[in-house]
Amino acid sequence: MYNPYQQQGMGYQQQQQQQQQQPNGFYPQQQQGQSSNQPQGQPQPQQQMAFNQPQATGIGGMPQSFGNSFSSMPQQPQTGYNNNGNNGSVYGNGNFGQQPQQQQQQAKPQHTGYVPNSSMPMMNTTGTMPPPNPAQQPQLQSIQPQGTGYYQAANTANVHSVQPLQSQGTGYYVSTPNLISSNQTQQPLQAQGTGYYQSQPQQVPPPQQAQSLQPLKPQQTGFYLQPQNQAPLEPLKPTATGFVNSFANNGLNNDIKIPAIRLSFITAQDQAKFETLFRSIVTNGSNTVSGANCRKILMRSGLPPSQLARIWTLCDTSKAGELLFPEFALAMHLINDVLQGDTIPYELDSKTKNEVSSFIDAINLSIANQDSSANDAPKTPFDEFITAGVQNLQPQPTGYMPQTSFGIPLQSQITGGGVASALNPQSTGFMAPTTFNMSMNTGTPGLNPQITGGAPASMQPNITGNALQPQTTGMMPQTTGMMPQTTGMMPQTSFGVNLGPQLTGGALQSQYTGGYGSVMPQQSGPASMPNLSFNQQGLQSQLTGLQPQPTGFLPPSNFSATMPLTAQKTGFGNNEIYTKSNFNNNLIDNSSQDKISTEEKSLFYKIFETFDTQNKGLLDSPTAVEIFRKSGLNRADLEQIWNLCDINNTGQLNKQEFALGMHLVYGKLNGKPIPNVLPSSLIPSSTKLLDNLKNQLKTEPTTTKEKPSFGKIDALSYKNNDDDVLPNYRNRRKVYSAKNEEQSSFSSPSAKSVNHSSSTLQTDDISVDKTVEKKTAKPKYAGFSREINLKNIASLENEIKNISNPENCYDSSIPSDLTSRFDAIIAKLPNLFNEISTIDNEITNAKIQLYRKKNPSSIIGSGPNGEITENDRKKAKSRALLRARMSALTGKSTESEDSLSMEDEQQSAEIKRIQQENGKNQEIIKDIRSSISDISASLKSTMTGSNMISNQEFERWEFGIGLEDGVREFLDDLKSNSNKSVTESSPFVPSSTPTPVDDRSSSPSYSQFKTAEERAAYLKEQAKKRMKEKLAKFDKNRRNVTQSSRSISSENSREQPQQIAGSSNLVEPRATPFQEEKYVEVAQPTQPVQSTQPVQPTQPVQPTQPVQPTQPVQPTQPVQPTQPVQNVYNAKQESDDEDEDDEEKRLQEELKRLKLKKKADKEKRLAALRKQIEDAQNESDEEETNGKDNFGGHVNVPQAAPVAPSAAFSQNSTNAPRSVHAAVTPAAGKNSTGLPSTTMGHNPYFKDASASSTSTFDARAAEMQRRIQRGLDEDEDDGWSDEDESNNRVAVDNKVEEAKIGHPDHARAPPVTAAPLPSVTPVPPAVPVPQANTSNEKSSPIPIAPIPPSVTQEPPVPLAPPLPAVDGFQEPPIPSAPAIATAVQKSGSSTPALAGGVLPPPPPLPTQQASTSEPIIAHVDNYNGAEKGTGAYGSDSDDDVLSIPESVGTDEEEEGAQPVSTAGIPSIPPAGIPPPPPLP
């Protein structure tokens, strides 16, 4: 390699004292004998020798450039690029002023072409002009042709001193004999064969003037071999520069056999270095590195011993305590990784393990297979020259690189000697380890050619005259004049350009031998210039004489220690392991790149974090600028630095940008210039990432957008396309149309496939909530994909329907009745399995509830179906802990947490066991279904004659198992169309969790019917169903009013009807709103019985007769005719939108039912407290009603009695009569409220029907307050009562008109009605049935009329006297009547049954004043109004019902009982009732 930093002043100032020394390696100037014994008068050949360019023929050899100090140069043939042109430019013509005539005699450029010159006589054209000093010519013998090619140098005759220089063959071929025609006193140099193959023996004339030239000393030109111990060579020893070289200088163990295997985890260059290092530390006779020797090297890395121990553990795969080469290379590789910041792996990857183990196996095989002769060098055709007559010549290592597994070691080269014995041939080509065998006489004629190349042996000699161009001819460092020398850097063979034979005379192609340092492989073309590196100066012109020439690496005096030497390739097979270009590029990059070191980054980051107090990750400009200003740089520099740092021009610096700015500031302070543009090494990584992302976005092709595919999209490959949802007008219109189409086309199959929630099985409350969410969670704007999908689905469904399915055609031989029976059975199976599964789930729920009742837990479950959640357990634990602390304070004993946990565990285990039983039952049901489907599949395949259908397929397509809801609906439609005789049924969906029954699960939806006949039948069926539901609602309303009484008296269970009602009440919370039909059957007989029992135990028979199963027709008859009218009306109005709204209504009813359930639960909690009070109160009420009031026994009173007396009596238990009347009045109010409330949500006050019993409102305080507000107190006549009466009259008139009763005059007789209305409130529950008839149509009330008189005749008489006695001023509660009247009208209009239930009690009041039926009716309305008014008041709070004055209620009961009876039956006289208290 060439060292550009070393001066090679081999000028002629020194040649007077000594001939130029030939640095053939690291030790230049080894031979000085040539000039020491030669007279001064022979300067020309000496100077020619001194002026020869260094010809690096070794691996490391490089041409060295000389300085321009050649003032004393004699004749110097210029062999530069431009013939003699380089004389002026390179050396300057003035340098040759002493002997200008010799300059004219310089050799012309040397053509180094390939023209063979075996047959032409050699003409020395390098000295075309004879020297002017003839006296010196005898001593200056012409240089003999010097064969530097690969041919054999022939004998040359002596030539005269005046004879020009002979041709010098510098090619690679064996030189043919050069015919020299001149004789001279001093024999010229013989042609030297520098080729590769055998050189023919050259005729060497006897030496003449041998005293003038001493034989050359041994020259060591290699890098790693030990220099010869010679006194003059010691000061010129090479300095090993590098970690590897420091060990290599101690010697290499070349006996190690290392297979030529590449390790992929390290580079080839690193592997070569590691191999050299390995050879330097391995002892002789061993193939491994001992632990001690390896420790010396590894400890130099500076790593802590703990890490080195881990590396050793990983590398010592054989656990032998010693490392083979692959293990050693692995250790060095791991150390390098750690030094570069990586971590030591816990385990080697499999690839690395395999490579190391295979390498070790190869080493073991090579050791096992080698024999004693394996160490001998391979035999070559040149072995005969190795020992041929070499005397007193030391072996000279001329190679640069060590013996490695990548190339065969170079043989020693004998380069000097006074004998004509042949030098050992040396192979500089492809892996042939021969040595030079040609001897060279320095000063004696005829040096033997020396083989240095690898070209064929037939190369022609090259002429060195006539404008020879400078040329590098080999790779091994050799002295010119002794052997041809390559001054280039790369081997000349087998790398693409082989040097052709160069004749020394003739117009051949000139071959450039270098004008600059570090010449790359030569090209033999005339105008080809070698590449330059290191900006070296051009090689000076080169003489072909015997001047000493440095051909190896230069002395290490000025050698840079930072540039380790890299070996060079010497053969064709030695791949790029030793290429110098890799190192050069890396060196240039590393030296030129300006980077921020990790130490700087850590320091700058700390500074940044110190000033970034808010942890924003950014420094504002004032702070950053102030930090930069502290450096003392001028404003211009700081501005330039800021522009470079603030890359994004944000006025703020992040951490990386701040570190960059600080680095530039410190660089400027250290004398480095501020760059105009940031180099790539200083650009922050975050900026690079953003720039790369921007470039990718810019370069991404925008024309390759794919159309959106509407198939199934994989989540991994999904990429959103924003263009699909751009808000343009076209998209908006399409979205709206799609939405409207969905809403208006529920009957279309596409809509059914999407909106299938109305027909899915709803088996529990959770599923109901989910369906509500599904309906309400529709996206406001649907995308294109949804619309198109719906259209595609619809088109596919139509195509499927239009295709006839021949597989469904049964075999004609099978009777049609069998096929129809088969189809009917198959159609029934899904529903059957569904019912079985549901029933089993209900049984499971019942078992769980039964267990919980038998084993009540202190933990109250808040989960679905009363399950205990984790939150409940936490609350229970916290309560237990609190109780424990309180007990510790009070000294009481409480249950421990352990008992609580044990109880919880037992309950959980029991519930789990019950659920496991349910799971087993479900599995049994599944097995039965699979077996049935198997049999059915075989039967169907037999009947249709088609292929056998698998069990799973049959279950899937016939039973709908595992199908989407939309697909199941579509299959049902197909089946209904193909088999009209088969009833539609929804596919069976087994539920794994216990769920309550849903009667509506199997009901078809309106959208499923395609034909007009089916739709008409469906509408009729729905009308009937709604009629039944209305009846059920009416009965349920009545039952809800009495639920509290049933709950209070449920434990007493005096009669079976009460027990039935209680059981129905328990079932109700779990039942869905679609089970009203069941309620109709159970409620009708039970309600009247319950109502009569609590209030009047003496006359239960009378109410039961009309209401009991014997006379249920009477209440139902009036109700049924009224409801069908409404149902027909509803069917006409709601036929279009009933399907859409029916589901929502039912869901709302379900939610209301859940709320009622909660209230009923609250009532049950108070049942135990009220039971005893109610029993005593009921007894007292019955006595009073029997003795005093005959009219108070209306059916209304019994219903209200159970609920109201509890609330009223709980507050005022002292006054028995008042409590009775209070109980009566709130009950009536509650009935009135309860009836509209149970109309399924039309009355907003329905919520308080069940909650009235739980109210804690003070009834008496409310009554007194309202009396004062309404002016009902007779003593305090402030005029309010008159206004109230007028208001009541107006309200009554309005109500009468709206109810179509047509008695406004009688309605205006409010004075009587005002007072009795609040008191008579209990009547409505019994009368509801008759009044429903009167309000809706007067024809129907007849059957109901007998019921009220029988009940009313008894209680009214006793009730009337106590009320006026208690408080006579309570007549004015009229104001409440008008509000109630309106409510009654509303209720009556909405549901006539309810209105009828409320209205019957009022008529008794008008009968007192006028016996005519009309006033009675008006008073009935008034009464209802008052009653509803109380209900309206009480709807918001349960105590409003109780707030109605009790005394007024008694008077009204007396007066109102008779009119009611007269309305129904005119035989009842009003005279028995005392007149009402005076009206204001």
From Swiss-Prot:
One of its GO terms (cellular component) is cytoplasm. InterPro entries: DUF1720, EF-hand-dom_pair, EF_Hand_1_Ca_BS, EF_hand_dom, EH_dom. The N-terminus is blocked. The keyword Cytoplasm applies. Residues 269-304, 306-338, 633-668 form the EF-hand domain. PROSITE patterns: EF_HAND_2, EH. Residues 1-147, 185-214, 737-766, 888-909, 977-1147, 1169-1480 are annotated as: Disordered. Ca(2+) binds at residues 646, 648, 650, 652, 657. The modification Phosphothreonine is found at residues 241, 570, 993, 995, 1321. Residues 142-575 are annotated as: 15 X 12 AA tandem repeats of [SPNAG]-[IL]-[QKNGT]-[PSA]-[QT]-[GQAPISTLYK]-T-G-[YFGML]-[YVMGAQL]-[QVLNPAG]-[ASQPN]. Its main location: membrane. Residues 1131-1190 form a coiled coil. Residues 1319-1328, 1343-1364, 1467-1480 have a biased composition (Pro residues). It is found in: Cell membrane; Endosome membrane; Cytoplasm, Cytoskeleton, Actin patch. Residues 328-680 are annotated as: 2 X 23 AA repeats of F-A-L-[AG]-M-H-L-[IV]-[NY]-[DG]-[VK]-L-[QN]-G-[DK]-[TP]-I-P-[YN]-[EV]-L-[DP]-S. Forms homooligomers. Component of the PAN1 actin cytoskeleton-regulatory complex composed of at least END3, PAN1, and SLA1. Interacts directly with END3, and with ENT1, SCD5, SLA2, YAP1801 and YAP1802. Belongs to the PAN1 family. Component of the PAN1 actin cytoskeleton-regulatory complex required for the internalization of endosomes during actin-coupled endocytosis. The complex links the site of endocytosis to the cell membrane-associated actin cytoskeleton. Mediates uptake of external molecules and vacuolar degradation of plasma membrane proteins. Plays a role in the proper organization of the cell membrane-associated actin cytoskeleton and promotes its destabilization. Required for the bipolar budding of diploid cells and the correct distribution of chitin at the cell surface. This is Actin cytoskeleton-regulatory complex protein PAN1.
